[in-house]
C-alpha cells in the first residue's frame, strides 16, 4: 500500500490546479479517497466527529451484501440445473450463476458510475460514493432473465431522476435501487413478473442448457401462493417436486438474484449491526411496520374495519 500511496502522490500534481490533467481532478480525488482516508478537514462546524468517512461506510455495506450476492449466484445455477434436469456439482452451479450475474453488475456500475463521473466533472465536484452500494443492489433485486439493455435504461433513470436532480448522495429522497425496480416493474412488467423471468434456462459459454423437465414451473413461492386454488397447501420447486420450508429459509427457490436466502441476508444484517453501520431500531421498525400492515390486511374483510 505504501508503494501505491507514493505513486498517487507522484501523479497527483497533474490533477491539481494548473496540471495537464486538471479536468479529471474529480475522478482522481474519488479514486484516491476510495483507497485511502482523505487528509482534508472540515471548514465549518460538523454534527459528528469520527475517524470513518462515507466511503468506508459504503464499503462496509458492500461487504455485508456479499453473502447474499454469492449465494444468489449459486442459486441461479442451482435453479438452472434443476430446471433442465441435469446433474452438476457445486462449482459448476456457481460458475453458471456467476457468468449470468456478472454482466448485470458490470452494466449497473458502468452506467451508474459513468453518469456520476459526468455529473461530477460538470459540477467540478468530487465523485460521490453512494453508488458503490446502489450499483451492487440493483442487479441483486432483479430477475436473472432481465435484459441488460433494460437494466441499463432503468439504472440511468434512477441515477438521474432519483439522485442527481436532488443534489446527489445524502440529498436524494428516494432510494435509487428501489426506484430502479419500480421503473422496471411499471415500464417493463413482463420482464419483472410472471413465470418466465426467474429461472435461466439457456446455456452460457457452453455450460448448462437443454430441454426443461416435465412439470417445470418458474413461478416464485409467493406467485404460487397468490394463484393457488382454494385449499391448496403445497408449493413446488421448478422441477415439480414439493418445496420444503428449509428450501425457503436457505433460499433454494426462484426469485430475484439476491432476495431468496434468509440466512445470507441475516448474515449481512449481523455484519452491519456488528460494525455499527446499521441500527437495530431501524431494522426492527421495518419488521414491525410490515407485521402491522399485514395484520390490518388480514382483518380488512371484517365489517367493523370498513366503518
Give the positions of each predicted feature.
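Alpha-helical transmembrane segments in multi-pass membrane proteins
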Residues: 63-68, 104-116, 134-135, 139, ...
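Long hydrophobic alpha-helical segments that form multi-pass transmembrane helix bundles
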Residues: 170-265
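C-terminal ends of transmembrane helices
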Residues: 112-123, 160-169, 268-275
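Hydrophobic alpha-helical transmembrane segments
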Residues: 59-66, 103, 107, 258-272
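Structural signature of hydrophobic alpha-helical transmembrane segments
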Residues: 97-108, 146-152, 258
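N-terminal signal-anchor module of multipass membrane proteins
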Residues: 2-101, 105
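Conserved small/polar residues in nucleotide/adenosyl-binding loops
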Residues: 296-303
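A generic, well-ordered mixed alpha/beta core segment in the N-terminal half of proteins
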Residues: 130-201
Amino acid at each position: 500500500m505504501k508503494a501505491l500511496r507514493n505513486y498517487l502522490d507522484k501523479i497527483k500534481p497533474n490533477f491539481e490546479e494548473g496540471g495537464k490533467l486538471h479536468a479529471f481532478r474529480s475522478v482522481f480525488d474519488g479514486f484516491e479517497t476510495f483507497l485511502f482516508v482523505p487528509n482534508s478537514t472540515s471548514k465549518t462546524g460538523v454534527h459528528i466527529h469520527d475517524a470513518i468517512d462515507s466511503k468506508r461506510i459504503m464499503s462496509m455495506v458492500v461487504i455485508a451484501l456479499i453473502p447474499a450476492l454469492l449465494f444468489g449466484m449459486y442459486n441461479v445455477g442451482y435453479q438452472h440445473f434443476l430446471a433442465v434436469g441435469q446433474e452438476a456439482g457445486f462449482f459448476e452451479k456457481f460458475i453458471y450463476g456467476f457468468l449470468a450475474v456478472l454482466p448485470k453488475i458490470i452494466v449497473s456500475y458502468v452506467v451508474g458510475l459513468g453518469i456520476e463521473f459526468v455529473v461530477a466533472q460538470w459540477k467540478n465536484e468530487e465523485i460521490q460514493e453512494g453508488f458503490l452500494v446502489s450499483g451492487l443492489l440493483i442487479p441483486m433485486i432483479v430477475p436473472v432473465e432481465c435484459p441488460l439493455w433494460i437494466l441499463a435504461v432503468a439504472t440511468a433513470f434512477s441515477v438521474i431522476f432519483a439522485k442527481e436532480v436532488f443534489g446527489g448522495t445524502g440529498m436524494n429522497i428516494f432510494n435509487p435501487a428501489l426506484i430502479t425496480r419500480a421503473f422496471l416493474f411499471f415500464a417493463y412488467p413482463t420482464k419483472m413478473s410472471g413465470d418466465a423471468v426467474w429461472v435461466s434456462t439457456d446455456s452460457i459459454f457452453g455450460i448448462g442448457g437443454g430441454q426443461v423437465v416435465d412439470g417445470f414451473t418458474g413461478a416464485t413461492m409467493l406467485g404460487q401462493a397468490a394463484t393457488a386454488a382454494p385449499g391448496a397447501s403445497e408449493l413446488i420447486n421448478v422441477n415439480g417436486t414439493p418445496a420444503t420450508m428449509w428450501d425457503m429459509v436457505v433460499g433454494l427457490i426462484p426469485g430475484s438474484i439476491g432476495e431468496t436466502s434468509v440466512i445470507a441476508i441475516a448474515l449481512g444484517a449481523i455484519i452491519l449491526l456488528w460494525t455499527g453501520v446499521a441500527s437495530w431500531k431501524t431494522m426492527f421498525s421495518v419488521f414491525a411496520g410490515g407485521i402491522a400492515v399485514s395484520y390490518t390486511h388480514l382483518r380488512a374483510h371484517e365489517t367493523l374495519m370498513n366503518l
